[in-house]
Design a protein with these regions (language model features):
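Fe(II)/2-oxoglutarate oxygenase catalytic core
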Residues: 1-159, 165
């Protein structure tokens, strides 16, 4: 459902990024190979995603991003009825890492009460000059359209919010 803004970029100030960095550093995250919902994988490349990830479930950390997501929801004109937040997915991409084209909102209902993911966010935690690749492509049109997507390589502390069904 594409209505309102296609995406919204928020720039966190360096103090906030430092706090997020410190918080994550002190969490003792158990990084594991990233997995893609196997039900969604039928006939697809098993190397769709090559990265490490951990799930952050700490309530105050999640609430901080939930509150920002609510404000972005309003400012972007999406007007979703947001009732909660998933644990935050923290990912690390090494040399050769990737996550090919996908839709964040799968076909399966993931939450009690029938809720689905509505808003996604990617927060860039490194400056673009610290790595090669790492472009974020957001599709906003049909695959046969030109252009059909926009490419982002944002500075450290920038977050892109977008509707999960694109």
């Amino acid at each position: 459902m594409k209505y309102g803004d296609y995406y919204r970029i928020i720039d966190f100030n360096q103090d906030v990024i430092k706090k997020i960095d410190n918080k994550i550093s002190n969490m003792n995250l158990q990084m594991k190979d990233s997995l893609v919902n196997k039900e969604e994988l039928k006939g697809l490349d098993p190397n769709l995603r090559i990265s490490k990830q951990a799930w952050i479930k700490e309530k105050s950390f999640c609430k901080y991003f939930f509150d920002i997501g609510q404000k972005v929801n309003e400012l972007s004109g999406w007007n979703f009825d947001i009732k909660g937040i998933e644990p935050i997915q923290y990912g690390i991409y090494s040399d050769g890492g990737k996550y090919d084209w996908h839709v964040d909102q799968g076909s399966k209902i993931l939450f009690k009460g029938g809720s689905v993911r509505k808003i996604s966010m990617t927060l860039f935690m490194n400056n673009p000059d610290e790595y090669e690749g790492g472009e974020f492509d957001l599709e906003y049109s049909h695959p046969e359209s030109k252009p059909r997507y926009k490419t982002f390589k944002l500075k450290k502390g920038s977050a892109i919010f977008f509707q999960s069904d694109v």
